[in-house]
Amino acid sequence: MHITIIGGGAWGATLAQVLTDNNHQVLVYDLNKNYINRINQGMHSIFDLPLKNIQSTSDLEISLLYSDLLVLAVPTKAMRQVLQQIALLSKTPKSFVNVSKGIEPSTFFRVSQIVNQIIPPSLLQNYASLMGPSHAEEVILRKVTLLTAASSDLSFATEIQKIFSNPIYLKIYTSSDLVGNEVCSALKNVLALINGILVAKGFGINSQAALISRGIVEMSRLVTFYHGSFKTVLGLPGLGDLIVTAFSTHSRNFSAGQKIGAGKTYEQIMSESDQVIEGFQSLVAFYQLQSKHQLDLPLIKAAYQLIYECRPFELVFDELMQRPFKSDC
């Protein structure tokens, strides 16, 4: 089948190769001329690795005519603008698969909520997310990876499962808990930032394990707030993606946290990076959410104080350690 990928960065270009491996015809849309040229020359947009039988264009109208299945692989902060253009130019109903992991800071919206707000019902056929522990650096090398396709319409999740699954290296599970999948996938980026800070400060594996455990508690609180399922927290988009993002040197969020821990500011890191670090934006959204609704998310609060208020690490850490005694979980 024909599939259009909206966004030709590391993950978008990698998924294009996955779909081509599965004998689908893929067109990648992006505005980055360098990405387009590399893909059309048979190279990955980011990695120095070949791509086979994939075309790319900067013409959104052509991209929308090419397929009625759109894979959304753009940063969350750009999602609203891209969807507005899609709504304006689409002539037929579309099905969407979101692979972007983040929360919109200005609204606290998950991507599914942005889609439902922007795309008219007459143009919105189906929606799913595709999440889980999946560094593009490994998937493009066809290393075994497991993901979860989540949709409120389980039959559509099953359809996406069949489209993306590859018998050699990619297995897709399904879930009807779309909300939980989206929340977990956004929060794990924030927890990876925090773990990077801990590593840079010389904390050991005991401390990192404690962060993961308490991070899972905060993840469950957020999923509950959004009316998702706790089981999702323990699944691929929750615990699975948290492990890979919080500990891997491939992780942009973990690496950014290390830089924060070494003394760099948020502004310095962003000025030096040419790739999206979703954890920074999601942190703002979750911090504002916990402030507005009085949620008990001490790790979120601490990370925000460190990164955006530039409070000394020692003071923030001491406040965490001096919190009242309580039972676990």
UniProtKB/Swiss-Prot annotation:
Chain segments annotated as transmembrane: none
Pathway: Membrane lipid metabolism; glycerophospholipid metabolism
Keywords, alphabetical: Cytoplasm, Lipid biosynthesis, Lipid metabolism, NAD, NADP, Nucleotide-binding, Oxidoreductase, Phospholipid biosynthesis, Phospholipid metabolism
Entries under Pfam families matching the protein: NAD_Gly3P_dh_C (PF07479), NAD_Gly3P_dh_N (PF01210)
Domain of life: Bacteria
Positions bound to NADPH: W11, K101, A136, R252, V276, E278
EC number: 1.1.1.94
Compartments reported by the entry: Cytoplasm
Enzyme active site: K188 (proton acceptor)
Reactions listed under catalytic activity: sn-glycerol 3-phosphate + NAD(+) = dihydroxyacetone phosphate + NADH + H(+); sn-glycerol 3-phosphate + NADP(+) = dihydroxyacetone phosphate + NADPH + H(+)
SUPFAM superfamilies: 6-phosphogluconate dehydrogenase C-terminal domain-like, NAD(P)-binding Rossmann-fold domains
One GO location term (cellular component): cytosol
Binding site for sn-glycerol 3-phosphate: K101, G132, S134, K188, D241, S251, R252, N253
Any one of the GO BP annotations: glycerol-3-phosphate catabolic process
Family matches, as InterPro entries: 6-PGluconate_DH-like_C_sf, 6PGD_dom2, G3P_DH_NAD-dep, G3P_DH_NAD-dep_C, G3P_DH_NAD-dep_N, NAD(P)-bd_dom_sf
Residues in coiled coil: none
GO MF: glycerol-3-phosphate dehydrogenase [NAD(P)+] activity; NAD binding
Major subcellular site: cytoplasm
NCBIfam families in UniProt: PRK00094.1-2 (NF000940), PRK00094.1-4 (NF000942)
Family to which this protein belongs: Belongs to the NAD-dependent glycerol-3-phosphate dehydrogenase family.
Functional note: Catalyzes the reduction of the glycolytic intermediate dihydroxyacetone phosphate (DHAP) to sn-glycerol 3-phosphate (G3P), the key precursor for phospholipid synthesis.
Protein name in the entry: Glycerol-3-phosphate dehydrogenase [NAD(P)+]
Species this protein is from: Phytoplasma australiense
Lineage of source species: Bacteria, Bacillati, Mycoplasmatota, Mollicutes, Acholeplasmatales
